[in-house]
């Protein structure tokens, strides 16, 4: 088999429709839906949505990804995205902005770019972290917290067919030929 240099947006196909599921889940929510907590120690649905956006921006900024610096600058005006956790329009705006940054990088990078590393200090050690590791970290973060969001909304009796029942999968694989 010949190794191909594939555009990352092709490799991560499906993540884009998961983003649509996140937006569709958050967009219709009221302030009451966004601030409700099942337990005082858990994040609210609004805090979860803000955390998803902030996680994307933070991790892509760590690897020096284009557009991340501009979003970090915009974030400074908020202090933290938790400040918008009660506003569905702002949450959707940041989900879309952070996804736009992710998508532009996935469109620009190919599989050969996955092995580029950056230095990341953590708990007294300095790690050589690859783009592959970081992108997988962000995918896992989106999926984990998207599931958490689905549960928080489900506990409130809010149906989330895309994010819940379909697991965020809006794109179906092609039908097999007979």
Features from the language model and the residues they span:
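Acidic catalytic patch
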Residues: 108-124
């Amino acid at each position: 088999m010949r190794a191909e240099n594939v555009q990352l947006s092709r490799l991560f196909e499906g993540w884009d429709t998961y983003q649509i599921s996140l937006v569709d889940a958050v967009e219709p929510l009221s302030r009451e839906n966004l601030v409700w907590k099942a337990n005082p120690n858990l994040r609210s649905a609004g805090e979860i949505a803000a955390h998803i956006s902030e996680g994307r921006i933070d991790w892509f900024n760590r690897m020096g990804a284009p557009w991340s610096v501009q979003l970090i600058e915009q974030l400074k005006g908020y202090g933290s995205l938790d400040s918008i956790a009660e506003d569905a329009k702002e949450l959707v705006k940041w989900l879309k902005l952070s996804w736009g940054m992710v998508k532009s990088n996935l469109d620009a990078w190919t599989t050969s770019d996955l092995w580029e590393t950056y230095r990341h200090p953590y708990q007294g050690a300095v790690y050589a972290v690859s783009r592959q590791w970081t992108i997988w970290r962000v995918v896992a973060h989106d999926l984990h917290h998207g599931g958490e969001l689905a549960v928080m909304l489900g506990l409130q009796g809010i149906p989330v067919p895309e994010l819940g029942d379909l697991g965020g999968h809006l794109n179906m694989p092609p039908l097999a030929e007979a």
